[in-house]
C-alpha cells in the first residue's frame, strides 16, 4: 500500500503536528510505502525511512497545484492523508487529490475542537468555514480522530460521520526508568 501524508510544515517551530509526523513515519514505514509532502522551511525536522517531497507554497498557487498533481500521477498512492485544518493549502491538496479519484483521510489534530472553533470565530474561522474548511471536512472520505472526545466533537459539527479513532502513539525507546526513588514528604497548599 502507498500512502502520501501532506503536512503544511515540517519546520521545528511548527510544534505538535511536526513531532507527530516524525513519530508516525518512524513506525508507519514498517507497514506501507510512505511519502511525505510539505513545503520548504528553514529548519525542517529529519524524517527518516520515507521520501519527503517539497512543493511550492500556497502563494504560488499554480506551481503548488502542478507539482502536487505530478506527484500524485507519479506515485499513484492508495491513500492521501491530509494533516491540518484552517489553512487553504490543506483544503486544496485534498480537493485536487479527490478530483483525481484518490481517497483522502483528514486528520484535524484537535483543530476542530469547540474551544478552537470559538477562538477568532467571526474574523477567521467563519470565513474559512464558508470558503473551504467545511467543504473539506464534509468531503473527506474518513476523518481521523485521536480520542473519543474528539470524535464526539466532530460528530456534533454535523459535517461528516465517517470518523475513525486512532490514538497517537508514544515513543518509549529513549525513556529511561528511574532506578531509585527518593520519598519526600511535602505539603501542597492550593487556595
Question: What are these language model-derived features?
Answer:
Residues 2-4, 144, 179-191:
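Conserved donor-binding/catalytic core segment of Leloir-type glycosyltransferases
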Residues 79-114:
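An aromatic- and histidine-rich active-site surface loop
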Residues 99, 112, 125-143:
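Membrane-proximal helix-turn-helix segments that form the acceptor-binding/catalytic region
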Residues 82, 145-146:
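Short beta-strand scaffold positions
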Residues 155, 165-184:
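Acidic anion/phosphate-binding donor-loop and adjacent secondary structure
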Residues 1-43, 48-51:
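N-terminal subdomain of nucleotide-sugar transferases
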Residues 45-71, 75, 79-88, 119-125:
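A short, charged, and often flexible helix/loop element on the N-terminal side
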Residues 40, 149, 169:
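Carbohydrate-associated surface elements
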Amino acid at each position: 500500500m502507498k500512502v502520501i501524508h501532506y503536512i503544511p510544515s515540517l519546520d521545528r517551530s511548527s510544534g505538535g503536528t511536526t513531532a507527530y509526523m516524525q513519530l508516525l513515519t518512524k513506525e508507519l514505514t514498517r507497514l506501507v510505502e510512505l511519502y511525505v509532502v510539505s513545503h520548504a522551511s528553514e529548519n525542517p525536522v529529519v524524517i527518516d525511512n520515507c521520501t519527503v517531497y517539497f512543493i511550492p507554497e500556497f502563494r504560488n498557487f499554480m506551481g503548488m497545484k502542478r507539482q502536487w498533481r505530478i506527484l500524485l500521477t507519479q506515485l499513484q498512492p492508495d491513500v492521501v492523508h491530509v494533516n491540518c485544518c484552517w489553512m487553504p493549502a490543506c483544503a486544496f491538496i485534498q480537493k485536487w487529490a479527490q478530483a483525481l479519484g484518490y481517497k483522502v483521510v483528514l486528520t484535524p489534530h484537535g483543530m476542530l475542537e469547540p474551544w478552537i472553533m470559538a477562538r477568532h470565530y467571526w474574523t477567521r474561522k467563519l470565513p474559512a468555514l464558508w470558503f473551504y474548511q467545511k467543504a473539506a471536512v464534509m468531503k473527506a472520505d474518513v476523518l481521523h480522530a485521536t480520542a473519543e472526545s474528539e470524535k464526539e466533537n466532530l460528530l456534533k459539527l454535523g459535517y461528516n460521520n465517517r470518523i475513525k479513532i486512532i490514538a497517537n502513539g508514544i515513543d518509549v525507546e529513549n525513556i529511561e526508568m528511574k532506578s531509585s526513588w527518593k520519598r519526600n514528604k511535602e505539603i501542597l497548599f492550593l487556595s
